[in-house]
Amino acid sequence: MEKFTTLEGVAAPMRIINIDTDRIIPKQYLKTIKRTGLGQGLFSEMRYNDDGSENPDFVLNQPAYRNAKILVVGDNFGCGSSREHAPWALADFGIRCVISTSFADIFFNNCAKNGILAIVVPPEDLEKLFEDAERGANATLTIDLAAQTIKGPDGGTLHFDIDEGRKHNLLNGLDEIGLTLDQKAPAIEAYEAKLAQREWA
């Protein structure tokens, strides 16, 4: 998993509450178990018209936000079913950070497992970030995970809280398998060294 240390990128605003996982990645894209290629289906019911053409009104289709790395979204993002395809689709599109006042628990945990930083902020901070994100091409935020700060385009800085274990895993690029190996590595190395010293009949 890619390490998350500092992220600087355009933030796209989505002033919509209760965006569920069905809207993040519709069911027709769930047939695959691959993590790649799902970015095409991200928010597809909002991104595309019925004829398959792009909806020009959707934020990620607008020139200023096509390469957004950060989403600033409404309350209760990622609610609904527990599909891990939702963070897969976000990551494949290029989204590394999502900021809201609250997330569904399963989605929140799945983000961390897939290298996406989900940040919870109070309503007044979210409104400030929405205003920053609505600047279009100038909507650049800088996320410093080690310092737990969000720096806006005007230089203002907001602080956020994060669980220390989640922070450690993201900073070091550790998913569940990587974390297990990281924790067990000394014991594994000692066991292998002991085996190497044994005399086999």
From Swiss-Prot:
Pathway: Amino-acid biosynthesis; L-leucine biosynthesis; L-leucine from 3-methyl-2-oxobutanoate: step 2/4. Catalyzes the isomerization between 2-isopropylmalate and 3-isopropylmalate, via the formation of 2-isopropylmaleate. Keywords: Amino-acid biosynthesis, Branched-chain amino acid biosynthesis, Leucine biosynthesis, Lyase. GO terms for molecular function: 3-isopropylmalate dehydratase activity. InterPro entries: 3-IsopropMal_deHydase_ssu, Aconitase/3IPM_dehydase_swvl, AconitaseA/IPMdHydase_ssu_swvl, IPMI_Swivel, LeuD. Signal peptide: none annotated. HAMAP family: LeuD_type1. Its EC number is 4.2.1.33. Heterodimer of LeuC and LeuD. Transmembrane segments: none annotated. It comes from Methylorubrum populi (strain ATCC BAA-705 / NCIMB 13946 / BJ001) (Methylobacterium populi). This is 3-isopropylmalate dehydratase small subunit. It catalyses: (2R,3S)-3-isopropylmalate = (2S)-2-isopropylmalate.
